[in-house]
Amino acid sequence: MAELTAKKDHRSEIGLVQAVAAHAFGVAVGELNGRNGTAGRARQVAMYLARVVLKLGLRETGRAFGRDHKTIFHACRRVEEAREDPTFDRTVEWLETLVRRAASAPA
């Protein structure tokens, strides 16, 4: 029973990460799981937030996004490289803060 609750909690946290990233990049949440490239940066940032803020493993994050663990690794690396741009870095930092606060808020 506890295992089911833990999985449910991760799903709601993943939903939070996806909603925050989608809103920040002006795309629909549904586009994040699609194969279309227009939501690519938002999808990469959502994957990055799942790994960094939620501390999910590569495989677990991959399952949540319907992607292979290698894709998650690549997405996180791309976001880390893009953080060289100060504007993008501030955006990601802000998103990390939002997700941390929302994830730790009482239900």
Language-model region placement:
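Residues in the recognition helix of alpha-helical DNA-binding motifs
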Residues: 64, 74-75
